[in-house]
Structure formats: structure tokens, C-alpha cells
């Protein structure tokens, strides 16, 4: 950080950093709070009331048999019409990171429209994560603040990067990932300019000087602290699942590589669906309503047969920890595989959002299913399957470790690193590369 002209400006900058981090954390909490209450009303209270009114239809995973079709098709209609009427499209997380790293700022002229565009697919049950649209909104807000305070010093322009770090930290409750991703300019090492070969190559992360690291740490602490504090005081908020201790014995070590290969295959299915849905989207052309309603229909079908394929997956992961033994192994495995394919299809067909939370849940569901089949420790299986699925999709073990570091106990982390390296080290088949 260049030395500020006056000590007063330096102090003002540090205060602004802490406030920016706190505001980013508060914005993440508020978004999740609205989303959780909206989902609860739309997917719990209304179908329950309909089931009471029509007992003959009071069945299915949501208490009213045809309900997913009503809501998902309505959601597709609204999402498509909103895009058609406003022209608003949320950037994915890599696009946000690339703009912040390259320009040091993010556009803030349509933040209200972007917020609604990010929220709609989540409310209607989309198997997408909130991280993409929400991070763009927070980066825009931080750019707006930085532009108005830059007269106090050029360093205030860095508030966009600092706010983005704080937002990612609060989103994933993962300080390491929140610190590294904006510096890399990519959430998974596959930025806009990544080609077929570099997609699986090493990313370059220029670590800041010690003074900058302290400043970044203040922003990250402010964001995560505010997010956790609001969650404790008011409730709400999401975050990565936290798993208990893992037992790693001879049986688990025997299954390490096979489980990692299954997770890798699950990650490859993500790319199969991504390529197929991109081709379908291009074939349909500029018809956002048609594409979004087709995506809604696919979501409704999957959600009726496999309910856990819906939604981002962070809440469902906590539920699976307690209930996975009551679900057949085949259903858990199918859920993981189908969800990995459903997420990119929804994104390419207009239900825009992130893919991190859903892909993580795919690995969790897959791991629990394979734990039932193999008899191996469930947390071990979840750690290996989640890390390998994410490694296959992200192609960067460093990013996988940073994202999942706080999810697993020490023994699970070691296995997670090995699985991520295996999955990322196996080259993607050429037809699946961009």
C-alpha cells in the first residue's frame, strides 16, 4: 500500500476498510436472510396450506404433489420475462473476479436490478448458488463507496477488492478462499482467458506485501465477524457445512483412490451437461422466456423425483448429516450425479447463479451414498468425494483446499488434499474442454 500523504488519511482509510468489510458481511447476511424466509414461505407454508385444502394431493416431497411444476414453471416465466424486459444478466463469479482484478472496480449502475436477478432463481428452487450475483452486487457497492472517497487518497480505490474479499469470506465462511480468489482474479483458476491447456494449469497469485496483508485481513475479519454476529443475534445466514471427526483406517485408505475417481467422474458430468446445455441454448437463440421455462420444467421433474437436487444445497447438506442413513444409497448417489448435471444446465438456460454450493452438495450426497455401500467412515467418504468432485470442476487443488479447509477435521483435510490433487491431475477429455 503506498504511503498516504497524511496520518489522518491513513487512519480514515483503515476505518473505511473495516467498515467496508462489515458492510459486505452485513449485505451477505441480509441477502441470505431474505432468501431463506422467501424460500420457507414459498416452499413450506404455501404447499402445506394447499395440501390441507386438497388432501388427495397432499403427497410428494413438498406436501402437495404438483407443486414443483407450478412454482418452477412460474419461476421460469418470471426469470425469462425479467431478463427480456430489463436485459439484466448477472455475471458469474469468475467474471466478477476478473473485472475486479483488471479494473479495480465493478459497475454499480444497475445494482437493484442485479440484486433481484440474483434472488429470483434462488427463491424458485434453482440448483444454483448465491455467490455469483451477490458478489457482483457487493463489488459494485464497494466501487461506489471508493469513488466517493478517493479524494482522500488513491488507496480508497482498493475498497472494491477489499469488499470482494470480505464478501467471499462471509459467503463461504472460508477466509483463505476469500483472501486468495480476488488476488488470483478467478474463483477457480479458470478465468475468462483460460484456454484448453491452461484450464488445468497453475494459476498465478501475487501475494501482497505485509502491510497490504494486514489491510486485507482487517476487511476479511470485518466481513466474517459481522456476518457471524448477525447470524447469532438475529438468526439466518448460510455457510459451508461443518463435519465432525473422521476415522481413517485401513478400510478407508483402501477406498481413497476409488472414491476419488468416482468424484472425478461426477465432476466430469458437470462438463458434459455444461456443453450440452450451451449447445441447446445457442440453438434456441435469444428467447429467454422459452429457455428459462424449459429449465424450470427440468428442475421440477428432477425435484419431484429427487428432492435434494433442488436449491443451493448448503441447508440440505446439514440435513443429510442427520438423515442420510434413512435414505437409500442409490438415491443419494443419483442425487449427487443429477445435481452436478442440473446446475450448469440451469445456468446456461437463464437461471443464472453460482455453481460452488451445488457442486459441493453433489460431493456430500455422493459421499454419504458410497459410505453406506462401502461401510467406510462417512465423513471420510464425504471429504474425498467432495474434494474430488470440486477438484474435477475447479481444476485447482489450491482453490479446493482454500474453499473446503474449514469444513473437515484434520484427518479429513489430508484425505481431501489427496483427492483434490488426483481429480485435478487427471486431464479432462478433449470433448469436455472449452
Q: Where do the language-model regions lie?
A:
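Alpha-helical transmembrane segments and immediately membrane-proximal extracytoplasmic
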Residues: 1-434
Amino acid at each position: 500500500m503506498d504511503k498516504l500523504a497524511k496520518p489522518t488519511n491513513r487512519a480514515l482509510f483503515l476505518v473505511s476498510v473495516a467498515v467496508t468489510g462489515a458492510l459486505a458481511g452485513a449485505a451477505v447476511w441480509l441477502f441470505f436472510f431474505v432468501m431463506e424466509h422467501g424460500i420457507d414461505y414459498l416452499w413450506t407454508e404455501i404447499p402445506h396450506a394447499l395440501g390441507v385444502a386438497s388432501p388427495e394431493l397432499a403427497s410428494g416431497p413438498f406436501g402437495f404433489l404438483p407443486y414443483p411444476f407450478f412454482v418452477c414453471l412460474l419461476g421460469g416465466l418470471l426469470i425469462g420475462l425479467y431478463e427480456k424486459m430489463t436485459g439484466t444478466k448477472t455475471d458469474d463469479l469468475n467474471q466478477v473476479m476478473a473485472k475486479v482484478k483488471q479494473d479495480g472496480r465493478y459497475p454499480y449502475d444497475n445494482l437493484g436490478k442485479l440484486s433481484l436477478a440474483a434472488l429470483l432463481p434462488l427463491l424458485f428452487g434453482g440448483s444454483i448458488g448465491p455467490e455469483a450475483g451477490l458478489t457482483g452486487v457487493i463489488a459494485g457497492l464497494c466501487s461506489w463507496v471508493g469513488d466517493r472517497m478517493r479524494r482522500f487518497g488513491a488507496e480508497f480505490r482498493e475498497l472494491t477488492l477489499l469488499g470482494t474479499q470480505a464478501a467471499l469470506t462471509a459467503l463461504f465462511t472460508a477466509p483463505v478462499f476469500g483472501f486468495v480468489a480476488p488476488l488470483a482474479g478467478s474463483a477457480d483458476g479458470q478465468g475468462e482467458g483460460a484456454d484448453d491447456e491452461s484450464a488445468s494449469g497453475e494459476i498465478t497469485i501475487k501475494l501482497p506485501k505485509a502491510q497490504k496483508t494486514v489491510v486485507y485481513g482487517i476487511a476479511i475479519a470485518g466481513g466474517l465477524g459481522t456476518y457471524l454476529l448477525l447470524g447469532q443475534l438475529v438468526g439466518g445466514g448460510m455457510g459451508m457445512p461443518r463435519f465432525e471427526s473422521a476415522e481413517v483406517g485401513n478400510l478407508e485408505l483402501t477406498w481413497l483412490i476409488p472414491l476419488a475417481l468416482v468424484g472425478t467422474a461426477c465432476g466430469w458430468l458437470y462438463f458434459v451437461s455444461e456443453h450440452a446445455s450451451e449447445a441447446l441454448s445457442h440453438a434456441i437463440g435469444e428467447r429467454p422466456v422459452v429457455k428459462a421455462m424449459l429449465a424450470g420444467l427440468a428442475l421440477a421433474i428432477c425435484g419431484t423425483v429427487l428432492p435434494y437436487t433442488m436449491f443451493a444445497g448448503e441447508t440440505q447438506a446439514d440435513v443429510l448429516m442427520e438423515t442420510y442413513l434413512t435414505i437409500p444409497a442409490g438415491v443419494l448417489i443419483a442425487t449427487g450425479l443429477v445435481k452436478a448435471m442440473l446446475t450448469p444446465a440451469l445456468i446456461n438456460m437463464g437461471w443464472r447463479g453460482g455453481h460452488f454450493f451445488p457442486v459441493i452438495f453433489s460431493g456430500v450426497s455422493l459421499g454419504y451414498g458410497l459410505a453406506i455401500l462401502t461401510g467406510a467412515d462417512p465423513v471420510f467418504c464425504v471429504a474425498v468425494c467432495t474434494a474430488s468432485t470440486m477438484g474435477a470442476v475447479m481444476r485447482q487443488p489450491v482453490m479446493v483446499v482454500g474453499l473446503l479447509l474449514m469444513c473437515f477435521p484434520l484427518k479429513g483435510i489430508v484425505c481431501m488434499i489427496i483427492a483434490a490433487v488426483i481429480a485435478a491431475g487427471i486431464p479432462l477429455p478433449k470433448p469436455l474442454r472449452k
